[in-house]
């Protein structure tokens, strides 16, 4: 259940808090050892998935500390230190954890590089044709069997309510709808929510969210319910919907898929989404590098992580 929920639930706490929060850390000296200890402690006290990952694949953050500390030398260059710290962060297997220097950014990519792409641009182009419609970044077409096809490649830009009304009204003659979010790397959670709410006629419980309240791996606040509410004065889709996903459906798209899975008349087909959960926080290391990581913890409707 934990694995399923971690993949299904996305970063929907960002609906409540936008932007990036910053954590003030204890003072460490600007040396390989000081930067190492600062980074390790930040993750140990603030990253929300350590206990989950210990249960999921045996991650032992204390052992990680011992193993990687052995690789430090007092004379190592900043580049060498960056490599060691990046490899240590990759043990978390989280694409939302990044180390950023003035000229480099670390990122865990195995969550999609090690799996089939499950997306063919040429096939998609054949479905869309040359005369497809577009509005607010959504590409849509009516297929020969009277099925609507909508491709949403990003949630970076906003989707206008009027544009959604226009799209859904035009597609109302169709027998069903295919909503393709493969290769959608995420973006604005408000945009993802705005699209999802057009597929329900009633307020739906989506899941729960809790916050880190202390340095312990299991110190969280009481879970708070998260709901999806439809705009009753807007056009809403009333027929069956299939949502297509792959490993590159990530971040805000992961949240979108989680919302859609809770709705009636919606079926999700495809590979597991890439994940990407929690509220992004940032901390600065003594050498000026910025550590980006996640803090809150999403839970499903049964209160399981």
Task: Show the residue positions of the predicted features.
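C-terminal "exit" segments of structured domains
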Residues: 282-295
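Single conserved hydrophobic/aromatic residue that forms the stacking wall/gate
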Residues: 293-304
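Active-site microenvironments of hydrolase-like enzyme catalytic domains
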Residues: 186, 230-237
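Flexible, low-complexity junctional segments that flank or bridge functional domains
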Residues: 21-211, 219-226, 240, 282-284
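Short, well-structured beta-strand/strand-turn elements
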Residues: 250, 264-276
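Bacterial Sec-dependent N-terminal signal peptides
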Residues: 1-29
């Amino acid at each position: 259940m934990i694995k399923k929920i971690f993949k299904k639930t996305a970063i929907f706490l960002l609906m409540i808090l936008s932007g990036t929060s910053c954590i003030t850390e204890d003072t460490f000296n600007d040396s390989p050892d000081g930067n190492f200890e600062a980074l390790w402690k930040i993750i140990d006290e603030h990253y929300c998935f350590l206990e989950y990952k210990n249960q999921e694949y045996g991650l032992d953050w204390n052992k990680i500390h011992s193993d990687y500390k052995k690789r430090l030398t007092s004379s190592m260059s900043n580049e060498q230190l960056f490599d060691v710290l990046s490899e240590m962060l990759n043990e978390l297997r989280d694409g939302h954890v990044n180390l950023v220097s003035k000229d480099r950014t670390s990122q865990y990519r195995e969550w999609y590089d090690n799996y089939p792409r499950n997306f063919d641009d040429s096939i998609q182009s054949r479905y869309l044709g040359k005369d497809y419609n577009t509005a607010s970044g959504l590409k849509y077409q009516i297929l020969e069997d009277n099925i609507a096809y909508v491709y949403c490649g990003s949630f970076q830009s906003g989707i206008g309510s009027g544009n959604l009304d226009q799209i859904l009204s035009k597609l109302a003659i169709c027998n069903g709808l295919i909503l393709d979010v493969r290769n959608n790397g995420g973006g604005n959670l408000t945009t993802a929510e705005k699209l999802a709410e057009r597929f329900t006629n009633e307020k739906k419980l989506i899941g729960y969210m809790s916050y880190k309240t202390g340095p312990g791996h299991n110190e969280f606040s009481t879970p708070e319910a998260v709901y999806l509410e439809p705009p009753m004065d807007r056009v809403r889709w009333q027929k069956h919907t299939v949502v297509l996903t792959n490993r590159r459906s990530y971040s805000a798209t992961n949240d979108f898929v989680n919302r859609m899975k809770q709705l009636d008349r919606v079926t999700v087909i495809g590979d597991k989404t890439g994940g990407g959960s929690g509220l992004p926080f940032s901390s600065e290391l003594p050498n000026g590098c910025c550590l980006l990581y996640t803090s809150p913890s999403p839970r499903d409707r049964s209160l399981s992580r």
